[in-house]
Amino acid sequence: MLNNHSMMSAIEELIDDVVANDTNATDFPDYDINDSFSHFEWAELAPVLVVYSLTFILGLVGNVIIITSTLCPRLRPLPATPTNVFLGGLATADLLLIIFCIPVKIAKLFSYTWTMGIFLCKVVHYMQSVSAICSVVTLTAMSVERYYAIVHPMRAQYTCTISQARKIVIITWITSFLLGIPMIFTQTHKQVGEKYIAYWCVRDSEAGLLWRFHEVYMLIVVLILPLSIMAFCYATICWEIWRVMKRRYHMTSRHALSPNSVDTESIPMTQRQSGNERKSRRDENDDELRTIKQVVKMLVAVVVLFAICWAPMLIDNVLTAYGCLPRLKNGTHKHLNTVFQLMAYFNRWT
């Protein structure tokens, strides 16, 4: 029989099935499902349970509010804009994961085995993969939309429309369902134990090449390729904003250095009105520029947060698949592995 430490390490590994860390069934021929229920490490389970619970409650409420605020015509307090349409699609992707996956994972915290059959084993992880892909593709589409709206405003008048945004959201969902298909083949419903039969829902390490390909594939699709596009779009946007601000600064400086010793009473009324109109237009332009900067900052913050939350787990998956990190996490590796997964779920309600 496994000792408590090795059993809890294996069990914790399987609880964290988001990461590709599984073990061969023959490694645990004496696995006893009844005996495993008598070992609860609350110091390790409690933080995971708290974060999953907060993710479900806050994510459910927050994403429903965003969806109703951006996509529901009768309840929509926010203006109908392409950016808000994308935000609604992003919230829908996160809500999908929360409804279909979080309750299942909370149940797994206390079962240590998979009792819901092979269908849900594959569907739950497939929907999680679809949600992650849909989120990052939507974020990428938002960055491209902002790029056209700010760098190419004339072209954006007929490309960055609400109808176009809705079409892109639909295409994003279809693409995400297709790109998530490899997860179905890498997740396996594995029988463990000989005297006491149980099942685990883990990555199929026996298909080593497929497993490694899938982890690299997810790293490229979810992180590297989208972030490259986002980095280009936002770098170009920042450069354009800096260029516009610099030009306006020089125009204002030249206006301030112009002769001003003339008594204002000697200036004709029509010129005074013209000066007031220019000042009013300048104030409107400044307000518009501040709004653009706020929107860009918000979108950049969303992208940076997504990268920080997902990169550690995706990189850990690849290193584990290629044998650079142990499949069974013990000590520091186990705690870091748990933190990486909690970071990924934290992204769902931030």
PLM features: what roles do these ranges have?
Residues 50-53, 57, 61-64, 99, ...:
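Generic alpha-helical transmembrane segments of integral inner-membrane proteins
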Residues 11, 238-289, 323:
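Intrinsically disordered, low-complexity cytoplasmic regulatory segments of eukaryotic proteins
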Residues 28-39, 109-133, 152, 157-166, ...:
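Loop architecture of class A 7-transmembrane GPCRs
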Residues 1-61:
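Extracellular N-terminal segment of 7TM GPCRs
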Residues 41-53, 76-144, 148-162:
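Extracellular TM2-ECL1-early TM3 structural module of rhodopsin-like
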Residues 54-57, 89-92, 103, 120-123, ...:
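Hydrophobic residues within alpha-helical transmembrane segments
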Residues 229-230, 297, 303-318, 337-350:
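Seventh transmembrane helix
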